[in-house]
């Protein structure tokens, strides 16, 4: 208790020193995206009005008196004990389910409302004063010993981080995010700290805070380490509940042992995951989730889990580790099918996987060029021709393999769209634009492959098609790239035609 009191005193002192300096800052009300509320949507069950109890009809006959039964007191006593026992058990489970959802103390609620008012347009977005009030609200929570993992406590800390960002105090915001992440990570790793029924929600909050913190992160290697650390924690949680994921790892282990025995590439049996077996349709042709799949092991944090995996892929690309990005994406697509993710997201991930295979092929092409340059610089006596030939064959084989797999990924999305033509009619009705974007991206990807092979007329047509689709879906990033590649193709066609003449 003494140690707890000292920590609380230090925390309050630190905040008060900081709050006293806030009013001296200049305000920079730049627009920054608001944080999402980390709480699950509240149930409106308790707000429903109960129906009145109907009264007995006026002329209904009176019920005859029941004859008294022996040992009635004893039976009533037993019944009373049973009711008390059930009530105690019910109260215990109610307390456990609401332990992370405790309400703010009244003193903190008052300051919280004042802080919200200060950051509103009514007070000209006074973020400095709002920050001071949020810190004060957190102090009130500490004095009332509010659970540091509770939704309300975490929400106040996230609002403080948001104010830091709006005041361009990114280092302070990042430090607060790190403090939150450390607290959640420690709680999830200490046995009994988080109740089993609450682990999913706590993991969900942990991943959301992680994703938010990475929006202002500038250190790529640090970001990768954080992602890996928290993703492995979530993965272990899924593994403990999902027979499918256990089977996945067992099959991977068997495959690797077979590869060692017969000296094969572990990815020789690469297959795509876009098929009618994995993606279902309703009677009107709308893509739907497969309700027969049991994806409960991935709930309630599967959206956050796959967003974090995509971020890890992006960080790998930023650090030029294309092989790691590719490996992560292959696994992600397969797991998205297991987790019964929205069909459009599976399609888009498959198309993105094709792009990663093409990037890897480009890297291997650059490696081939380096080998050839090395050969031209060194004499035959200095160069070990046997080693050189082996290296060239290995790199060339892997490059061709990556190009082949990129085509498989793009082809699977386009062929799937052709086989299920109703997708085209419903593209504009879909709330999720990823379906149309995946088709546009795959069409563009096939154009890039055709350009790489020198089939200019086909490449030109595919680029034009992808531009049309990108405009329809407002896929501006793809639109810019497709227009650039179309211009390049047009120049090459003109040069080729001039050369023939």
UniProtKB/Swiss-Prot annotation:
Membrane topology type: Single-pass membrane protein
Keywords associated with the record: Membrane, Mitochondrion, Mitochondrion inner membrane, Repeat, TPR repeat, Transmembrane, Transmembrane helix
Main localization of the protein described in the UniProt heading: mitochondrion
Cellular compartment(s): Mitochondrion inner membrane
Stretches of the chain found on the membrane's Mitochondrial matrix side: 1-77
Function: Component of the mitochondrial inner membrane i-AAA protease supercomplex, which degrades misfolded mitochondrial proteins. Together with MGR1, functions in an adapter complex that targets substrates to the i-AAA protease for degradation. Required for growth of cells lacking the mitochondrial genome.
UniProt protein name: Mitochondrial inner membrane i-AAA protease supercomplex subunit MGR3
Naturally occurring in which organism (per UniProt): Saccharomyces cerevisiae (strain ATCC 204508 / S288c)
């Amino acid at each position: 208790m003494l140690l707890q009191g000292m920590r609380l005193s230090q925390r309050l002192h630190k905040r008060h020193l900081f709050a006293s300096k806030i009013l001296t800052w200049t305000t920079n009300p730049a627009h920054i995206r608001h944080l999402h509320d980390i709480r699950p949507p509240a149930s409106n069950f308790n707000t429903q009005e109960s129906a009145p109890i109907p009264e007995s009809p006026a002329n209904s006959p009176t019920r005859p008196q029941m004859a008294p039964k022996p040992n009635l007191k004893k039976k009533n006593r037993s019944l009373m004990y049973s009711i008390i026992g059930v009530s105690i058990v019910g109260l215990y489970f109610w307390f456990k389910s609401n332990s992370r959802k405790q309400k703010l103390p009244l003193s903190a609620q008052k300051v919280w409302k004042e802080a919200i008012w200060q950051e509103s347009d009514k007070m000209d977005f006074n973020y400095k004063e709002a920050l001071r009030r949020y810190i004060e609200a957190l102090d009130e929570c500490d004095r009332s010993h509010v659970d540091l993992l509770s939704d309300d406590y975490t929400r106040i800390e996230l609002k403080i981080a948001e104010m830091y960002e709006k005041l361009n105090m990114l280092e302070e915001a990042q430090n607060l995010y790190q403090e939150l992440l450390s607290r959640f990570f420690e709680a999830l790793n200490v046995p009994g700290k988080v109740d089993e029924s609450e682990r999913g929600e706590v993991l969900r909050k942990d991943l959301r805070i992680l994703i938010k913190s990475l929006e202002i992160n500038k250190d790529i290697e640090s970001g990768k380490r954080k992602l890996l650390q928290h993703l492995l924690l979530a993965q272990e949680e899924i593994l403990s509940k999902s027979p499918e994921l256990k089977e996945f790892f067992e099959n991977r282990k068997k495959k690797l042992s077979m590869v060692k025995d017969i000296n094969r590439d572990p990815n020789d049996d690469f297959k795509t995951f876009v098929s009618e077996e994995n993606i279902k349709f309703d009677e009107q042709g709308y893509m739907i989730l497969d309700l027969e799949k049991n994806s409960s092991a991935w709930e309630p944090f599967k959206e956050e889990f796959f967003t974090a995996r995509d971020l890890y892929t992006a960080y790998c690309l930023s650090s030029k580790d294309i092989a790691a990005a590719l490996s992560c994406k292959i696994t992600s697509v397969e797991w998205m099918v297991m987790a019964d993710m929205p069909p459009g997201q599976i399609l888009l991930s498959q198309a993105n996987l094709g792009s990663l295979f093409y990037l890897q092929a480009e890297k291997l092409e650059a490696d081939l060029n380096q080998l050839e340059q090395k050969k031209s610089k060194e004499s035959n006596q200095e160069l070990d021709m046997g080693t050189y030939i082996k290296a060239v064959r290995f790199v060339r084989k892997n490059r061709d393999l990556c190009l082949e797999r990129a085509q498989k990924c793009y082809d699977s999305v386009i062929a799937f769209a052709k086989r299920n033509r109703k997708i085209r009619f419903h593209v504009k009705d879909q709330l999720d634009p990823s379906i149309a974007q995946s088709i546009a991206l795959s069409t563009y990807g096939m154009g890039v492959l055709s350009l790489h092979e020198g089939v200019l007329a086909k490449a030109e047509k595919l680029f034009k098609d992808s531009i049309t689709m990108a405009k329809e879906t407002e896929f501006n990033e793809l639109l810019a790239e497709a227009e650039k590649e179309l211009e390049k193709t047009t120049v090459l066609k003109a040069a080729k035609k001039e050369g023939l003449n």
